[in-house]
Amino acid sequence: MVGIEDKSAKRPIYKLAAPALIDLPNVGSAKAFDLEACVNANPDLVILPMKQKDTAQTLSEMGIATLLVLPESHEQLMEMFTLIGTATNSMEKATALIEYYNTKLTAVVELTKDLTDEQKPVVYIGSTSDILRTAPKEMYQASLITTAGGKNAGDVLEGTSWTDIDNETFLTMNPDVIVIPTDNFAVSSPDYTAEDVLNNATFADVTAVKNGAVYQMPVGFEAWDSPVPSGILGTLWMLHTLHPELYTAEQFAADADEFYFTFYGFHVALDQAA
């Protein structure tokens, strides 16, 4: 690698898995890509999100190979692994990652296959910026919930990006469980906490609030609710959160440790992941 995303030092995964990468030249972010810095790094390949397709076109015209990815579903995530594995001559690792995903997802399907509709809680996942922003049915986060044996509250919404709702809509959704993701860097909760939600008088009659079923995803690793290589851990964490009788905290912690050691080369302490 010759260049890395902006604010990489804030992301725990780099410090845990490959701290030397933090010192590479900063080429900006998905929202503010630094074309000049990228070109100056003299890359053989640039991997960009689909939203940067105009930048990719510019790089291609300059003779720099560019790969665009859009992992907004499980299928697209698997496709991304294959594309990057092929482009970087690392298909053995990509294949191992895909096989790991398929094995774990098969296990999740087996564990949840006998759940009745009544046993599947309505789950509301907030965004990193506001509890009144959630994932519509076409987002990756929605599939994470349904795969883990839940019903995404945001399925009543259309779109492929975080969608704003009002208090009335939230109250009408009346979720059984509320999930709060990490912030964008996975170092803390977002701009609000589980306590903020539980103490919000407007939400007092929401089932999840009444039952104390408001959960913060683990911080200190990665944003597991996102379509990233470790996204499978988001599904497994969700499975434990929604159905601890089917998949225990100890099982999740062991799986998280196995994943990070297998694909990143470091161990995760049991109490860090559970």
Predicted stretch roles:
Residues 52-61, 182-197:
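A ligand-binding cleft/hinge motif common to bilobed small-molecule-binding domains
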